[in-house]
């Protein structure tokens, strides 16, 4: 596969103690993609028995072998990221460059309160995912679960339960409250949500999931909305959401 201009390829690996020091499935994934290397490989640290030093050594090995240019973390705490950075400095290894974190209207604290400190201290940026909260922030649910939505797909029972929960209904009400703001900006609530995620300090990109080219183009329209998100507009959105993160200091 040829590398198109402006495209960034990434992979995610899951570590277990037995898989160290070689991340599992990485070469197989590269073969399936017909690539010699990816731009960035993310380490999903799901096994607390994997020593941090060995994870950092494994990712350094991946980069030194030419399989990736950089490495990042996924679903790591700020403390774990700082520990990895300290290990890299102590043993002359390669530190992570970014964290992959969930971020949307109803999941804010980590990206707004924890990761900016890492960005300023050690330069670790953020790649965020689920800007639409698995479709909850699209106004398509509106208190019900349509037959065509993801919540009806096998394996997504948890999403259906979330949509139908009291908390889910409250969140859907907040989404409906945002409709006038979206209309004022000439966009959909989904575009507003993606632009809102991009506004956060240290966020380099937002991961999108789409099922059609039309949906992709609609989501990309959020880039036009970003320039319209004035400080006053953000304050108004915060007031409607009622869940702005606050420093504990």
UniProtKB/Swiss-Prot annotation:
Enzyme class: oxidoreductase
Tissue: Strong expression in brain, with highest levels in neocortical and allocortical regions, hippocampus, olfactory bulb and cerebellum. Also strong in kidney. Weak expression in lung, skeletal muscle and heart.
Matching InterPro entries: K_chnl_volt-dep_bsu_KCNAB, K_chnl_volt-dep_bsu_KCNAB-rel, K_chnl_volt-dep_bsu_KCNAB3, NADP_OxRdtase_dom, NADP_OxRdtase_dom_sf
Keywords, ordered alphabetically: Cytoplasm, Ion channel, Ion transport, NADP, Oxidoreductase, Potassium, Potassium transport, Transport, Voltage-gated channel
GO cellular component, one term: monoatomic ion channel complex
Location relative to the cell: Cytoplasm
Pfam families (alphabetical): Aldo_ket_red
UniProt xrefs under Gene3D superfamilies: NADP-dependent oxidoreductase domain
Binding locations of NADP(+): 44, 74-75, 100, 129-134, 140, 150, 209, 211, 215, 218
EC id: 1.1.1.-
One GO molecular-function entry: oxidoreductase activity
Domain of life: Eukaryota
SUPFAM superfamilies: NAD(P)-linked oxidoreductase
Family assignment from sequence similarity: Belongs to the shaker potassium channel beta subunit family.
Subunit architecture: Forms heteromultimeric complex with alpha subunits. Interacts with KCNA5 and KCNB2.
Function statement: Regulatory subunit of the voltage-gated potassium (Kv) channels composed of pore-forming and potassium-conducting alpha subunits and of regulatory beta subunit. The beta-3/KCNAB3 subunit may mediate closure of potassium channels. Enhances the expression of Kv2.2/KCNB2 alpha subunit-containing Kv channels but not Kv2.1/KCNB1. May display nicotinamide adenine dinucleotide phosphate (NADPH)-dependent aldoketoreductase activity. The binding of oxidized and reduced NADP(H) cofactors may be required for the regulation of potassium channel activity.
Family annotation (PANTHER family): HYPERKINETIC, ISOFORM M, VOLTAGE-GATED POTASSIUM CHANNEL SUBUNIT BETA-3
Name assigned to this protein: Voltage-gated potassium channel subunit beta-3
């Amino acid at each position: 596969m040829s590398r198109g201009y402006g495209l960034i390829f990434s992979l995610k690996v899951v570590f277990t103690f037995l898989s160290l020091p070689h991340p599992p499935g990485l070469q197989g994934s590269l073969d399936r993609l017909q690539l010699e290397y990816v731009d960035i490989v993310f380490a999903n640290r799901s096994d607390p028995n994997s020593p941090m030093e060995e994870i950092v050594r494994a990712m350094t090995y991946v980069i030194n072998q030419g399989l990736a240019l950089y490495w990042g973390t996924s679903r790591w705490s700020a403390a774990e990221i700082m520990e990895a950075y300290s290990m890299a400095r102590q043993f002359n290894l390669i530190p992570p460059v970014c964290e992959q974190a969930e971020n949307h209207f109803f999941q804010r604290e980590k990206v707004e309160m924890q990761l900016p400190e890492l960005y300023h201290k050690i330069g670790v940026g953020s790649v965020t995912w689920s800007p639409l909260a698995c479709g909850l922030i699209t106004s398509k649910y509106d208190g019900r679960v349509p037959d065509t939505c993801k919540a009806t797909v096998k394996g997504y029972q948890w999403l259906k339960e979330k949509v139908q929960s009291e908390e889910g209904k409250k969140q859907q009400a907040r989404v409906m409250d945002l409709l006038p703001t979206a209309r004022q900006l000439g966009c959909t609530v989904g575009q507003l949500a993606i632009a809102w995620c991009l506004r956060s300090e240290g966020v380099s990109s937002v991961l999108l999931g789409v099922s059609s080219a039309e949906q992709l183009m609609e989501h990309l329209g959020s880039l036009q909305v970003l320039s319209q998100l004035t400080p006053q507009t953000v304050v108004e959105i915060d007031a409607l959401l009622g869940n702005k993160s606050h420093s504990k200091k």
